[in-house]
């Protein structure tokens, strides 16, 4: 059974504090938008899908007990709080897309003469809560689509590397993209989970993912919890791993995908893609449609969040870097579309060059 990172009942929200894992499993109450902003910004909750869900549900928790004099005052409250939540971690596009959708709903309900203030509030709460279940369903579809894409590629490639006699595969993933990064099941880790369910996962390798160690702390925690055949490797071992272990595919998540397929993901993703290209290993990005930003033409336009120096210089309270050294700590890098084999979504797997046209048709834009 997969881990539960988000616990929600109407009026109540708790998140599993990911800063304490794997040593301690502790749920933290999120009582409103200010709490939501803090747990996102401090990375007590992380992963682009989970950020959006926790952000929106924190607003639902805050407005649930409140009474509003007018629909206009409710709409103003919604708009201001959503804009604030988007600022918590700006690289992940899911929160911005969710905020835009909810604000659009609030605007429509404000204009509707047959909708009362209580009705508007109820419909808004329903919409935020629906995101939770939709994310789980989308993740399962991503998992199935990605697993089939990998297995199909292996089956059609003569003498494919990374496979055993029964067609099982060895895969590599980076950062954390599982139940802890989503409402449940996962994106890239959802693909791996689906391979395991099909009996086609021979082995999964996960990187430590410095400096926050999401791979060592979180992905490894999930893999051990679910008893997957798994091995942790250092970030600096990826080239040696792909050379020595015959990995069939690399699968990573995404915080934002540009219209041309350029992908912003956890720092270190770009160099893994370069190494995968050199070794002829397919490199897949697994992401829901909400992570694809067609308004951004390329990765050059993606804002990259920079984190505090302390995250590099300390482990917990212990300094590991020489005092006085300067640090550069971008949380993400951008992998060029030319290095990406396919982008796995809940609606199918697309090559980067066909992404914009395909998504535009799917969404009827």
From Swiss-Prot:
Its EC number is 5.3.1.23. GO terms for biological process: L-methionine salvage from methylthioadenosine. The record marks 175 as: Transition state stabilizer. It is found in: Cytoplasm; Nucleus. GO terms for molecular function: S-methyl-5-thioribose-1-phosphate isomerase activity. Pathway: Amino-acid biosynthesis; L-methionine biosynthesis via salvage pathway; L-methionine from S-methyl-5-thio-alpha-D-ribose 1-phosphate: step 1/6. Keywords: Amino-acid biosynthesis, Cytoplasm, Isomerase, Methionine biosynthesis, Nucleus. It catalyses: 5-(methylsulfanyl)-alpha-D-ribose 1-phosphate = 5-(methylsulfanyl)-D-ribulose 1-phosphate. It is an enzyme of class 5 (isomerase). The active site is at 255 (proton donor). One of its GO terms (cellular component) is cytoplasm. It comes from the Eukaryota. SUPFAM superfamilies: NagB/RpiA/CoA transferase-like. HAMAP family: Salvage_MtnA. Belongs to the eIF-2B alpha/beta/delta subunits family. MtnA subfamily. PANTHER family: METHYLTHIORIBOSE-1-PHOSPHATE ISOMERASE. Catalyzes the interconversion of methylthioribose-1-phosphate (MTR-1-P) into methylthioribulose-1-phosphate (MTRu-1-P). NCBIfam families: eIF-2B_rel, PRK05720.1, salvage_mtnA. This is Methylthioribose-1-phosphate isomerase. The lineage of its organism: Eukaryota, Metazoa, Ecdysozoa, Arthropoda, Hexapoda.
């Amino acid at each position: 059974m997969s881990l539960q990172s988000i616990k929600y009942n109407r009026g109540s929200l708790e998140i599993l504090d990911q800063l304490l894992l794997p040593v301690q499993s502790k749920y933290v109450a999120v009582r409103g938008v200010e709490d939501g902003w803090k747990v996102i910004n401090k990375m007590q909750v992380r992963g682009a899908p989970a950020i959006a869900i926790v952000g929106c549900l924190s607003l639902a928790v805050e407005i649930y007990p409140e009474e509003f004099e007018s629909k206009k005052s409710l709409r103003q409250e919604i708009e201001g709080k959503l804009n604030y939540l988007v600022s918590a971690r700006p690289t992940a596009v899911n929160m911005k897309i969710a905020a835009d959708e909810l604000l659009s709903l609030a605007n429509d309900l404000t204009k509707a003469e047959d909708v009362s203030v209580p009705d508007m509030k109820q419909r808004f709460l329903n919409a935020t809560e629906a995101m939770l279940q939709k994310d789980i369903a989308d993740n399962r579809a991503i998992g199935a689509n990605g697993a089939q894409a990998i297995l199909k590629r292996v089956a059609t490639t003569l003498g494919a590397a990374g496979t055993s006699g029964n067609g099982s595969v060895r895969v590599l993933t980076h950062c954390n993209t599982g139940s802890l990064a989503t409402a449940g099941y996962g994106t890239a880790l959802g693909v791996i989970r689906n391979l395991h369910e099909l009996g086609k996962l021979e082995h999964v390798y996960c990187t430590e993912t410095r400096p926050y160690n999401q791979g060592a702390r979180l992905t490894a925690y999930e893999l051990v919890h679910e008893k997957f055949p798994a091995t942790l490797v250092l970030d600096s071992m990826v080239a040696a791993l792909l050379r020595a272990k015959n990995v069939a595919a690399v699968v990573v998540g995404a915080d934002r995908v540009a219209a041309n397929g350029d992908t912003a993901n956890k720092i270190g993703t770009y160099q893994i893609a370069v190494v995968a290209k050199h070794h002829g290993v397919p490199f897949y990005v697994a992401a829901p449609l909400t992570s694809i930003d067609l308004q951004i033409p390329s990765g050059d336009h993606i804002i990259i969040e920079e984190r505090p120096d302390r995250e590099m210089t300390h482990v917990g309270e212990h300094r590991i870097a020489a005092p006085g050294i300067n640090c550069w700590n971008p949380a993400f890098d951008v992998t060029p579309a030319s290095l990406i084999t396919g982008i796995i979504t809940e609606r199918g797997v697309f090559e980067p060059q066909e992404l914009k046209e395909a998504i535009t048709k799917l969404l009827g834009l």
